Every structure is written in structure tokens, then in C-alpha cells.
């Protein structure tokens, strides 16, 4: 039973988590639904670890900033982590009630809420208190497991279905009704904690209850509501198991609110079990709240027959608004029967971890209970003394059986200041006593294992995911086909599905055009062209309504235009050009003959033709901004032409100008057009075909064209007067053809030009033309390549079809995007390779440092997941945390030569910096100036491993993969790809790059064969790296099996001559090579800035000394009050400045502004002041300069010595 109770929770959790990850839906409620029933995901998806990890808060030691909370987290690491990540796991479920949606049971209970008139039913407390609803709980729990699918997630729609399905569940109602009492005993067998009913239901039955549950709850609740309350039902253990599920039903708003509070993100999905109920069934929220207190009491009374403990649990549960017990993930024992056979080693390991975690949580809960009990006693004794009633504050924890404690209980307990104080005290005591051990463990005593192996984020995720999965698997087996019934229905609620549905509708539209495209991109064009025209009309209507189709529309318009010209193209690109060309020629000739006779008339006529065409296109074009430009342009051109045509004939000049402008425009246009075509059509491979065809080989085409042109030349000569018009007309006529035409026109122009005297101008034209055709050729090639990579293209095309809009935006980028996308594909493939753990792979250790931090390098492949600091796993792989000072062992003042303590700040020998501080691992010691500089010069203090993984993978997928190495394997897969393991090291740091690059790929037996530093490794030389988690050296910050660098065990570096202790002057004596690395420069500047900021005067003084302006400005502290206000106290003195003391250095030109100082009341200072300050009056010309300035800066300078005098 326990299993079952857990399962539902787990399922919920899973769903929840999945929802959070990607379940297919964004809102938890749907989540659950989708998880269970969506067609796509029949199984509840167990969120992948990456997903979960992605959502996890980082696992740093929890520093809330609230000392008491910190103490709590320190004392109860496991609990803390549960609470902290609760939001992730069962999400609401762990920490909050399982929303009804999620709770299959909840669904049932919803119904109950609807149906139930019993006081009890109504009173269901948010806590889904089993006590109030033992029945509900019992039912729910069993249901939960069944639900595990969370099919019932979507309660609203499903309630009906559940009821419909109830028949399948008849047993459950029986269970609920009749068995309910029975279950209490039953649960014990199943798993004492789970709800009794569940056992009765038995796993198979349990799944059914899911659907029936609502009915059951409804009927049973009504019939048996009280039964459930019977002590029998209440069997404590069953309650424990069940209470959680039970919680779901209560619709307490407050639960929802709590959730909102705690998991703001989740709220909507599962407002709270209670909220959810209401939401799902539209039951007006159950008015549980008011009855709550009394109902609880009544229940308590009923239960008083049960052990007190249960009573307490119930109360506690009532209090827990968050209905899922923290221990929801307890491993149900029953699971093992089904699961064990399949369990892989990894699963078993995780399960062991899960159990360990569970044990830890239980231990912590017990301790918390004790603390709470103490607090309670303290409070009651205090109250007794004060005559207060002792019980004003309820202490839920001590009464709540451990397995039922929910987050709410803990929160409530922590609200009590006594509890907080006790926790704090205890934490302090612990810190004092165990501090030493802890520190050692954390720092690095070899033997010390950190006392509590705190789980890393990944572990927790792994465990939780495992718990879900187990529950899930159970559920899957039992998951009714019911889910499928709703799958379709649910898809609709599921945002993801919504998207799909919407998308499919769009697809339907798009398909009219694109079915062919999809089936056969190549054929597509022909077929599409033929069909296109018809469709274009349809589309255009749709298109206007459907922005999504914009692009399509543009494309189809172009298609339409293209079609006329290009059906032929398709069959014979070359022919097409000729034909088209000849058509154009025909037109051109007509025009041109006229042109010759009457240029003006021709223009008009041509213009009208253009207009006609433009109008045809333009209706479409209007929708197509690109075309707009053209149209606009063509209109402008038309105007221009009227003027310019005359000019052309009168003076070639005019022609030249417009032509240039025109040419430039046409090139731009060509480019734009190209980009546009590509953007719009590349997805559909259109342009490629087309362009490829029409520039099969730009040179060839050009020759062809030239030949044609030559033929046409005769006809064309007339055109010469009007090349521009012609071009224009054609452009306007058909953007798609524009480029060809541009070419042809440019050619015509060229050829005419050759005949004409325009040669020089034409030369330019030619050059441009040639260049353009070259560009075209390049683009063509690229496109061709892209075509060859068609698989990619297809993908891309498909994508483009799916997101026409993005394609639009990306249009211009399309080319670039495609190239990178190919590259990216390769990279991805590489990455996939890389993901199989390389032996020597090193991964970035902390995202913040990604670029610069040193990386763990598992050079000898002694595996272990590089990404994890799990103590509990097999040997924790070397984790060298050079990044921030993690818990450190107290600094040892050793003045001997500490091995490598000279980090930046430490004196060269002295205290080794706290152990993890940045670089003081004995790993690099830079002793002389040169070395220091060198170290600075390689700016990364540790080697950088250039790691091809995408950053996203850091915590997640990698870790998943690697953590599956069963401990038994001696070494993870040999390092197959040494080349990816490129480590750039600073020389002092370690095996030279060459060593690493060429390190023989590892021998599976020995790990990678590497140059071991003999001195370092000697004792281990003979040992193969057999991983044993408990090997003491695995507890070291570095693993003898992974020497960080070879050699280096000696001190002679410190003794060698010529290598002096680093001199710490800011500017070292002679940096031998006079190098100033950016790093040094930055440091110097920073020092300078700081100094300047903190000691402005001193800085100024030093600066002046440096520059030989000796100006001393001292601003002594003013002891009295500064009496500036009395400025005029000694008016007379000013007149005769006293020249004695300051005179020599005093600037003679001081301004009166300084007088304020002189007038200080205390006579002595004044005297001096006067001396100093009064001189200014003497000569007032230059005084403004330095003295005034400096004076203004620092108000009170008793001596303001200025350059002026000094230099005198």
C-alpha cells in the first residue's frame, strides 16, 4: 500500500516535474492531464535530469541570510534540500498539496466534494487531512498509485469519464465503502503506511480506482465517509501512507494560497488540492474553512479511539496545508516485487541512495520532532509561570507521524521562536563540536569522509526522478486504457497540444500549397506551379487572415509571377531564358521601333504596359513589402524616365547617370531579391532550383545569354536608347525574373555600349556586371551545396513551413543560417560522440567560471562522473575546486616552505591559503618574479580545457550518462578521442600540452597511460585504479590517480639560485623582459584607482613627488568644529599676510576663498592659517590655477603648497 500511496504522489510529482520540464503542457493541471492522457505522452514523463536540474536552485549551502533559517538548514541538510527543492519535485506535491489536477485521487475527491454532503466530506481539510478524510485518503492513496499516470489529472473533464469508467473500478467502491475499514489492516500488509484501501485494491485494483475514485469517493464517501473515519480505517500506518493523498481533496483555498505563496509558478496549475478541486469540478470552493476547526476536532474525537499518535497526525495533517508528506518518496516495499527484476545496477544504486536519503530525512525529522517537543515543553512551562494557556501554539510536528510530516508542518514549527532558538542553539553546538571533523572532512583529511554525505543536486534529482519513475512504472502497468480515451480530449487542453492543433490547422491551409512540397521537394515546384495558380486565389484570402501565411503568400505571389515565366524554366532553364528573352525582345522591339520614332510616345506606351503588369502584380505586391519597394521604385523610375529618356537621347550623360544609379539600384535590387527569394523560398527549395537552373553555371549561362543576346542584338539595337526603361519594365513585371532580366539588360547595355561610343561607361557597367555575376555564381554554389545537404535543407524547409514567420524574419539570414546550421549539425554529432564520457574529459566546473576556471581533468581515466561531486557514488572523481574557498580547514600558520602556497596574496612561503582558495593548491608555485609574471601571463591560472560540450549539457545530460558507470567497472570507457581533450596548460601547471595531446589513448586496464610524476605517485605506481568509493584517497581534493602535473615534488625550485623570493613591490625591480601583461596593468590600475579613491591627498602628493612638483597637501583632522561660518572674524589680518612659516612654500597667489579656513576660532591654527592662507591676497592673478583648484577640492587644507612657488 505504502507503495501505492507513494506512487500517486510520485506520479503527481513526476507529472508535475515533467510539466515543469516540458511535459507537453505548461500548466500543471494540464500537465497532469497531458501526462496521463495525452496521446503523445502516455506515460507520465519523468522529467529528464537536465530538465529538473535546470529548474533546481543551485545547491549552495543554503544561506538565507536569516540566521535562524540558516541554522535550520545547517542542522537538517536533507530536509533543507527537500524543502528547498520541493518546488521541483512533486512540485507542489512535495511541498504543497498535490493539486487535484495532479492528484488522480484528487480527481476522485473532487467528485466527493461535489457529492458529499457529509459534514466530514465537507470538512475535508486542505491538508487533505487523512484524519478528516481517512476514507478519502485511503481511496486516494490507492488511487494515486493508479493515477500514477495521473490520468485523472485533468479532473474537470475527467470526472465524468472517471465516473463512466467507474464500472471498471467496482472493486474500488467496494474497497472504499466496505473495505474502507478493512483497509486499515490491509495497508499494514501492503506497506503499513499506505492507505489500507490501497492494499485492498491491490496494485491492480489501485490503478483502477483512479477513475472510479471519483465515484468511489462520491459514493463511498457518502456512504462510508464516516466509515473512513473509523479508527479501523484510520490504521495509523495506513494513514501515514495515505494521509498525503487524502489531503488533495480538501479544497481549502488556503492551500491554494499557500501554494501560491510557495510556488508562485505552480499556483495556477494546482491551486491547491482544494483550489484545484474547485477549479476542476467547478464546485464552488468547498466551504471547508469554517467547518475546519470543528471538523478536525470531531475527527480527532472519532479517532481518539486510535492511538494518540494518529490523532496527532491527523491534527498535524490538518494543519499541513501542504498535503504531501515530505517523505512522499519513501520506497514502498511492495515495489520490489515488480521492479527488482528489471532494475539495473544504476537503479539499484539510486535506490540505495534514495533509501539513504530517506533515512536521513527521517532522522532529521525525528530530531526536529524532538526539538519541537522540547520547545513545546519550554513554552508550556513558561506559560505556566506566566499563567498563559500553554497551548496557544500548536506543535504539529511532535504529534505527526514522521511519514506524514509535510512541509507545512515544518514551516509551522519553524514559525515558533522557541523552536527556532533551539534549532539555532543545537546548530551552534554542533558547529562547535563537529566543526573540526566537518572541516577536516570538507577540506581534506584523507580519511575523513564528510560526515553527512550531502547529496548533490544531481543526486537529488536522480533520486527523485527515480522515485517518480518507480511509481510511474507501477502506474504504467496499471494505467488504464482510460487515458487513451481522453488523450484526444486532453490534447486540446494541453498547451503543447493546442499548439499542435493550431499548427495542424495552419498546416491544413499550408498543405494545400505544400503537401507536394513536403512529399517531394524537388517535384514540388512543378506540381506546385501547376496547382499554384488556383491555390493562390484561395490562399490569398486565407493569407490575409493568417499572418502565419504571409510568407507563404509572398512566396505564392512570387510563384504566381514566376509561374508564367517559369513553368518553362523548370523544363528547360536555358530554353526558358531564350523564350522569355525572345518574348521580351518582341515587346522591346515593338517598343523600340516606336522609341526610335518617338521616344516619348514609346515611353508612355511602355509605361502603360508596365502599369498593366504592375497592376496585375501589384495587387499581390501590395501585400509584399519587398515588391512595394519595387513598385514604388518603378513608379519613380517611370517619372524619372519621362524626364530622363529625353536626356538620354540628348546626352549620353543623362543615360550614364541614370544608368549608374539604375545599375546600382538593380544590383541592390538583385541582391535584395536574391536574399528575399532565398529567404522566402529556400525553405521550400524553390529558389535553389530555380536559381540553380538559371545560373546553372553562371559563366555558362552568361555565355548562353551572350549568344542569345548576340542573336537578338540586331533587334536590340533600338533598345539601346531605352535600356533603362526596358530594365525597369521587366523588373516591375516580375521580381523573380528580375535578376535574369537585369543580367540580360546589363548585357544588352554592355553590348550596345560596345557598339556605341559609351564604351568607358560601359566598362564600368561590365565590371559591375561581372562582379555581380560572380557573386551570383558564389551564391549559386552555396546554394548548390546547400542542396546537396538536402537532408538538412529538408529539415530546414520543414521548419520553415512550420514557422513561416520566423523564416520571414530570418530570410536575410537564411543563407548564413543554413551554413551554420550544417556546421552546427556536425558539431552536434561531435558532441554526441563527446558525450560518451571521454576518459580524459574535463568539464567546466562552475558555470560562472566557465571560460577561465581550471577544469577537472580525468587524465588517467579513472572515471567517476566528472560533473559530480557526489560523495556517495563511486570514488568521487577528482573535484578540485579552485574557484572559491569552500569550507576550508583553518589556516595552518606554517612558515616552512609550504608546498605551493604562494597564491597571489600569500607571502611566498607563509600560510598556505585556506585550502580551496584560488590557486594555492600546491599545484602551482610561482617563485621568482619571472615565474610570477609568467603565471600572470598565462592568464588562466589553471589549464583551460577546451570543451566542446554545449554549456547546456553541463550539469545534465552528461552527468546522466556518466553517472551510470556502475561502480564495478574499473575504468570508464577508454579515452577514445584524445583529440577532444585538449588542455591548454600553463607550463608550470602540468603535463605539457604535447603530452596530453599525444597521451596514448588509454589502455582499458590501466587507465590512460600517462606520465606519472614519479615522486608524487610513487606509492601508487603499481595499483590499478580500482574505484572504491571508500578509498581514502578518494576523499582528497585531488586524486593520486589523477596527478595534476608531473614532476614538481621538489623544493629545489625554492632553493635554486637566481630564483628569488618574489619581490612584492608593486612595480617589481626589473620585470626581466619589461613585460606588462594586461593582467598586471589591470592590477596596477586597480591599485592606483583604489589608492586614489581612498587617499586622495596622499595620492596627489605622491603623484607630485613623482613628477617633481612637490606639493604637500595635508588635510589634518579638524579637531574642533570647523568654524567656516565665522568667515569674517579676523577681517583685518587678511590685509597683511604673515609670511613667516608658510611663506616659502606657500603659494603667493592664494585666493580669498581660503580665508574661511584662516578664520578658525582657535588662535593657534589661525595664526598658521593666516600665514598660509592670507598671502593669496597679495597677487591675485595666477592664483586661480592650482591653488584655487586644489582648495576647492579639499576644503580644509592647512597647507596648500603650490607648484608656482616651488618652482620659483
Swiss-Prot record:
Transmembrane segments: none
Function: Required for proper assembly of the eggshell.
GO cellular component, one term: nucleus
Protein name: Defective chorion protein, FC125 isoform
12 X 26 AA approximate tandem repeats, Glu, Met-rich: annotated span: 493-788
Entry-linked InterPro entries: DEC-1_C (IPR006720), DEC-1_N (IPR006719), DEC-1_REPEAT (IPR006718)
GO biological process: chorion-containing eggshell formation; egg chorion assembly; response to starvation
Natural source organism: Drosophila melanogaster
Amino acid at each position: 500500500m505504502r507503495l501505492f500511496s507513494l506512487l500517486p504522489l510520485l506520479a503527481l510529482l513526476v507529472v508535475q516535474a515533467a510539466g515543469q520540464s516540458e511535459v507537453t503542457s505548461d500548466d500543471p493541471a494540464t500537465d497532469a492531464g497531458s501526462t496521463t492522457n495525452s496521446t503523445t505522452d502516455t506515460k507520465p514523463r519523468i522529467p529528464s535530469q537536465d530538465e529538473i536540474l535546470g529548474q533546481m536552485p543551485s545547491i549552495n549551502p543554503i544561506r538565507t541570510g536569516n540566521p535562524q533559517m540558516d541554522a535550520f538548514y545547517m542542522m537538517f541538510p536533507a530536509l533543507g534540500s527537500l524543502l528547498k527543492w520541493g518546488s521541483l519535485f512533486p512540485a507542489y506535491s512535495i511541498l504543497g498539496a498535490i493539486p487535484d489536477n495532479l492528484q488522480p485521487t484528487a480527481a476522485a475527491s473532487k467528485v466527493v466534494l461535489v457529492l458529499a454532503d457529509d459534514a466530514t466530506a465537507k470538512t475535508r481539510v486542505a491538508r487533505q487531512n487523512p484524519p478528516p478524510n481517512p476514507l478519502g485518503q485511503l481511496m486516494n492513496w490507492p488511487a494515486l498509485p493508479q493515477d500514477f499516470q495521473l490520468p485523472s489529472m485533468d479532473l474537470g473533464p475527467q470526472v465524468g469519464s472517471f465516473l463512466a469508467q467507474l464500472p471498471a473500478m467496482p472493486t474500488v467502491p467496494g474497497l472504499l465503502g466496505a473495505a474502507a475499514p478493512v483497509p486499515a489492516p490491509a495497508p499494514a500488509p501492503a506497506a503499513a503506511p499506505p492507505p489500507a484501501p490501497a492494499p485492498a485494491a491491490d496494485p491492480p485494483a489501485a490503478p483502477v480506482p483512479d477513475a472510479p475514485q471519483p465515484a468511489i469517493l462520491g459514493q463511498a464517501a457518502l456512504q462510508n465517509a464516516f466509515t473512513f473515519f473509523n479508527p479501523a480505517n484510520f490504521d495509523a500506518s495506513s494513514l501515514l501512507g495515505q494521509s498525503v493523498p487524502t489531503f488533495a481533496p480538501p479544497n481549502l483555498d488556503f492551500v491554494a494560497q499557500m501554494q501560491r505563496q510557495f510556488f508562485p509558478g505552480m499556483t495556477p496549475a494546482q491551486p491547491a488540492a482544494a483550489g484545484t478541486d474547485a477549479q476542476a469540478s467547478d464546485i464552488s470552493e468547498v466551504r471547508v474553512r469554517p467547518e475546519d476547526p470543528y471538523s478536525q476536532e470531531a475527527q480527532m474525537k472519532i479517532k481518539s479511539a486510535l492511538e494518540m499518535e494518529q490523532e496527532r497526525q491527523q491534527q498535524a495533517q490538518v494543519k499541513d496545508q501542504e498535503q504531501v508528506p515530505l517523505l512522499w518518496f519513501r520506497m514502498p516495499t511492495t515495489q520490489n516485487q515488480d521492479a527488482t527484476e528489471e532494475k539495473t545496477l544504476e537503479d539499484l544504486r539510486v535506490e540505495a541512495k534514495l533509501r539513504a536519503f530517506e533515512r536521513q530525512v527521517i532522522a532529521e525529522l525525528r530530531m526536529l520532532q524532538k526539538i519541537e517537543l522540547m520547545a513545546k515543553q519550554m513554552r508550556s512551562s513558561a506559560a505556566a509561570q506566566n499563567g498563559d494557556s500553554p497551548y496557544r501554539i500548536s506543535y504539529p510536528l511532535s504529534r505527526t507521524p514522521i511519514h506524514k510530516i509535510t512541509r507545512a508542518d515544518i514551516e509551522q514549527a519553524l514559525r515558533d521562536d522557541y523552536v527556532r532558538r533551539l534549532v539555532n542553539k543545537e546548530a551552534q553546538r554542533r558547529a562547535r563540536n563537529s566543526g573540526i571533523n566537518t572541516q577536516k572532512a570538507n577540506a581534506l583529511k584523507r580519511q575523513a569522509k564528510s560526515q553527512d554525505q550531502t547529496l548533490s543536486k544531481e543526486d537529488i534529482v536522480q533520486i527523485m526522478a527515480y522515485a517518480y519513475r518507480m511509481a510511474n512504472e507501477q502506474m504504467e502497468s496499471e494505467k488504464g486504457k482510460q487515458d487513451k480515451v481522453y488523450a484526444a480530449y486532453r490534447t486540446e487542453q494541453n498547451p503543447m497540444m493546442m499548439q499542435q492543433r493550431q499548427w495542424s490547422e495552419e498546416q491544413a491551409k499550408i498543405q494545400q500549397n505544400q503537401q507536394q512540397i513536403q512529399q517531394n521537394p524537388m517535384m514540388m515546384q512543378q506540381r506546385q506551379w501547376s496547382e499554384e495558380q488556383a491555390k493562390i486565389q484561395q490562399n490569398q484570402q486565407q493569407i490575409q487572415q493568417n499572418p502565419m501565411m504571409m510568407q507563404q503568400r509572398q512566396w505564392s505571389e512570387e510563384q504566381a509571377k514566376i509561374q508564367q515565366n517559369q513553368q518553362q524554366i523548370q523544363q528547360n532553364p536555358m530554353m526558358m531564358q531564350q523564350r522569355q528573352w525572345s518574348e521580351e525582345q518582341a515587346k522591346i522591339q515593338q517598343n523600340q521601333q516606336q522609341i526610335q520614332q518617338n521616344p516619348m510616345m514609346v515611353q508612355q506606351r511602355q509605361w502603360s504596359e508596365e502599369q498593366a503588369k504592375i497592376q496585375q502584380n501589384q495587387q499581390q505586391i501590395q501585400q509584399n513589402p519587398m515588391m512595394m519597394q519595387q513598385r514604388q521604385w518603378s513608379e519613380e523610375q517611370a517619372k524619372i524616365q519621362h524626364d530622363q529618356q529625353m536626356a538620354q537621347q540628348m546626352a549620353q550623360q543623362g543615360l550614364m547617370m541614370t544608368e549608374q544609379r539604375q545599375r546600382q539600384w538593380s544590383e541592390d535590387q538583385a541582391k535584395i531579391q536574391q536574399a528575399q527569394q532565398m529567404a522566402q523560398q529556400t525553405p521550400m527549395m524553390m529558389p535553389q532550383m530555380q536559381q540553380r537552373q538559371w545560373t546553372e553555371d553562371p559563366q555558362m549561362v552568361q555565355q548562353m545569354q551572350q549568344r542569345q543576346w548576340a542573336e537578338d542584338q540586331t533587334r536590340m539595337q533600338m533598345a539601346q536608347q531605352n535600356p533603362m526603361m526596358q530594365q525597369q519594365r521587366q523588373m516591375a513585371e516580375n521580381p523573380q525574373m528580375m535578376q535574369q532580366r537585369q543580367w540580360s539588360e546589363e548585357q544588352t547595355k554592355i553590348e550596345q555600349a560596345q557598339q556605341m561610343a559609351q564604351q568607358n561607361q560601359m566598362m564600368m557597367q561590365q565590371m559591375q556586371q561581372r562582379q555581380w555575376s560572380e557573386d551570383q555564381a558564389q551564391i549559386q554554389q552555396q546554394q548548390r551545396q546547400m542542396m546537396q545537404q538536402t537532408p538538412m535543407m529538408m529539415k530546414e524547409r520543414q521548419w520553415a513551413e512550420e514557422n513561416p514567420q520566423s523564416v520571414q524574419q530570418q530570410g536575410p539570414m537564411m543563407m548564413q543560417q543554413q551554413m551554420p546550421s550544417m556546421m552546427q549539425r556536425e558539431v552536434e554529432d561531435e558532441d554526441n560522440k563527446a558525450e560518451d564520457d571521454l576518459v580524459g574529459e574535463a568539464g567546466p566546473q562552475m558555470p560562472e567560471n566557465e571560460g577561465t576556471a581550471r577544469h577537472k581533468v580525468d587524465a588517467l581515466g579513472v572515471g567517476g562522473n566528472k560533473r559530480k561531486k557526489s560523495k556517495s557514488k563511486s570514488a568521487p572523481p577528482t573535484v578540485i575546486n579552485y574557484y572559491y574557498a569552500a569550507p576550508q580547514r583553518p589556516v595552518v600558520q606554517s612558515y616552512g616552505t609550504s608546498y605551493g602556497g604562494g597564491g597571489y596574496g600569500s607571502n611566498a612561503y607563509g600560510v598556505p591559503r585556506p585550502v580551496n582558495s584560488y590557486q594555492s593548491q600546491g599545484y602551482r608555485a610561482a617563485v621568482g618574479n619571472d615565474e610570477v609574471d609568467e603565471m600572470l601571463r598565462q592568464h588562466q591560472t589553471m589549464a583551460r580545457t577546451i570543451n566542446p560540450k554545449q554549456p547546456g549539457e553541463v550539469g545534465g545530460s552528461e552527468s546522466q550518462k556518466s553517472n551510470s558507470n556502475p561502480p564495478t567497472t574499473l575504468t570508464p570507457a577508454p579515452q577514445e578521442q584524445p583529440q577532444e581533450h585538449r588542455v591548454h596548460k600553463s607550463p608550470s601547471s602540468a603535463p605539457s600540452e604535447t603530452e596530453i595531446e599525444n597521451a596514448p589513448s588509454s589502455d582499458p586496464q590501466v587507465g590512460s597511460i600517462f606520465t606519472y610524476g614519479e615522486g608524487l605517485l610513487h606509492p601508487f605506481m603499481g595499483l590499478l585504479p580500482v574505484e572504491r568509493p571508500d578509498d581514502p584517497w578518494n576523499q582528497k581534493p585531488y586524486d593520486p590517480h589523477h596527478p595534476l602535473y608531473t614532476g614538481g615534488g621538489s623544493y629545489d625550485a625554492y632553493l635554486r639560485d637566481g630564483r628569488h623570493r618574489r619581490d612584492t613591490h608593486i612595480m617589481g625591480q626589473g620585470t626581466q623582459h619589461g613585460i606588462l601583461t594586461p593582467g598586471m596593468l589591470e592590477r596596477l590600475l586597480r591599485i592606483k584607482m583604489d589608492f586614489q579613491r581612498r587617499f586622495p591627498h596622499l595620492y596627489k602628493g605622491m603623484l607630485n613627488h613623482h613628477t617633481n612638483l612637490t606639493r604637500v597637501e595635508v588635510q589634518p583632522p579638524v579637531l574642533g568644529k570647523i568654524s567656516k561660518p565665522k568667515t569674517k572674524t579676523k577681517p583685518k589680518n587678511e590685509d597683511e599676510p604673515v609670511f613667516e612659516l608658510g611663506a616659502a612654500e606657500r603659494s603667493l597667489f592664494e585666493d580669498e576663498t581660503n580665508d574661511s579656513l584662516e578664520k578658525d576660532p582657535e588662535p593657534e591654527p589661525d595664526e598658521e592659517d593666516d600665514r598660509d592662507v592670507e598671502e593669496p591676497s597679495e597677487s591675485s592673478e595666477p592664483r586661480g590655477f592650482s591653488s584655487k583648484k586644489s582648495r576647492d577640492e579639499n576644503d580644509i587644507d592647512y597647507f596648500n603648497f603650490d607648484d608656482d612657488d616651488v618652482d620659483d
